[in-house]
């Protein structure tokens, strides 16, 4: 479970994220949806411990900054960061050792295969394209057998085959009872994945939707319902 309580992030006098609270339960895919600049990545980086913030973040009932929480928390950043001198496989093996993961050698072998990196395993971090680095980041996040997974704009830079594979991975994690949070502005890419959706605008969550409660409305209809002005000039709050 991932729980965010009154998360606020300021840069000087500018409020980037304003008292945001939400929860994603075990076995759910949560979508943090909004235009560029809405505050999605700031929330993601705060949850990941990359930014200082006010408020609270809980991972399976533990404080997000605790070592216990970090051991079960997989994170795929918007901009992947690689070790220049490590190969693709060495990245995965490094994560295994750093997290003391129980991932098997067979599972390590399978990860590059799933994301078409099998013939790239000996390439160094500084030899990888943006798309390949994104795939390695996903493999590393999966290598710890996470209970909570957070992905920031994960489909950007991926080829169609990798996007399809990533969607399958997300659904597999959901079936295993994992908590997944995806930050994106690409509605089409997540329309078949989500269980709960949080629509952001100007640093605030302006609407929350549960897929079980919205009848036959699709994700685009819901999003534009709350982000586009009403007829007659009125706007949704």
Write out the residue ranges for each language-model feature.
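Conserved ABC ATPase signature
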Residues: 124-131
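Catalytic Walker B motif of ABC-type/P-loop ATPase nucleotide-binding domains
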Residues: 149-153
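Helix-to-loop junction immediately C-terminal to a conserved catalytic motif
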Residues: 48
């Amino acid at each position: 479970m991932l729980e965010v309580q009154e998360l606020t992030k300021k840069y000087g006098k500018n409020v980037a994220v304003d008292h945001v609270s939400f929860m994603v339960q075990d076995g759910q895919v949560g979508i943090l949806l909004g235009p560029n600049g809405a505050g999605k990545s700031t929330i993601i980086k705060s949850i990941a411990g990359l930014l200082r913030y006010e408020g609270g973040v809980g991972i399976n009932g533990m404080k997000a900054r605790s070592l216990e929480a970090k051991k079960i928390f997989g994170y795929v950043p918007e901009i992947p960061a690689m070790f220049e001198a490590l190969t693709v496989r060495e990245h995965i093996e490094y994560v295994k050792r750093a997290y003391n993961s129980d991932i098997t050698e067979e599972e390590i072998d399978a990860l590059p295969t799933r994301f078409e990196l099998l013939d790239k395993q000996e390439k160094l971090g500084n030899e990888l394209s943006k798309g390949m680095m994104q795939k390695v980041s996903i493999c590393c996040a999966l290598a710890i057998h996470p209970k909570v997974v957070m992905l920031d704009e994960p489909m950007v830079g991926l080829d169609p085959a990798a996007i399809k594979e990533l969607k399958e991975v997300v659904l597999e994690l959901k079936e295993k009872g994992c908590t997944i949070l995806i930050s994106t502005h690409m509605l089409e890419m997540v329309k078949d994945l989500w269980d709960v959706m949080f629509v952001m605008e100007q640093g605030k969550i302006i609407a929350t939707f549960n897929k079980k409660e919205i009848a036959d409305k699709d994700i685009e209809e819901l999003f534009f319902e709350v982000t586009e002005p009403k007829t007659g000039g009125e706007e949704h709050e």
